[in-house]
A protein has these predicted regions:
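Short, intrinsically disordered or compositionally biased N-terminal tails of bacterial proteins
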Residues: 1-10
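N-terminal helix-turn-helix DNA-binding core of bacterial DNA-binding proteins
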Residues: 9, 13-53, 73, 77-85
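Alpha-helical residues within the helix-turn-helix
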Residues: 46, 63-64
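Residues within the DNA-recognition helix of helix-turn-helix
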Residues: 58
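Histidine- and aromatic-rich ligand-binding microenvironments
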Residues: 83, 98-99
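Internal catalytic or translocation cores that form aromatic/hydrophobic pockets or channels
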Residues: 88
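Alpha-helical "hinge/linker" immediately C-terminal to small N-terminal DNA-binding modules
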Residues: 91-95
């Protein structure tokens, strides 16, 4: 029998935080949309057909979970995926779900 690899508690905590971040339909949908590129909260709200405050709430959680990056461009606030690893993770989740 092969011994499982040892994973640090910090790494496990980060993995749990990421999974919690995706555990809501709106959050996962936001992540899927951001795979296509940057978007404003208003653009995301229009696509989701929800009030912008709903999107703002979910974006806060996604930023806290390090699944989404926020940046300012003039008066606009843009959100995007932080890296290619996050985009692959979203793709893997969708494939697991049979999408």
């Amino acid at each position: 029998m092969i011994a499982p690899p040892v994973v640090s508690g910090i790494a496990l905590e980060r993995a749990v935080e990421a999974m919690r971040g995706m555990a809501y339909e709106h959050r996962l949908h936001i992540l899927v949309m951001l795979r296509a590129g940057e978007a404003t909260p208003s653009e995301l709200a229009a696509t989701l057909e929800v009030h912008p405050t709903v999107v703002a709430h979910h974006l806060r959680h996604l930023v806290d979970a390090h699944l989404v990056r926020r940046r300012r461009s003039g008066k606009r606030v843009l959100y995007s995926l932080p890296d290619e690893a996050t985009a692959r993770l979203i793709g893997d989740v969708l494939r697991y779900a049979g999408v």
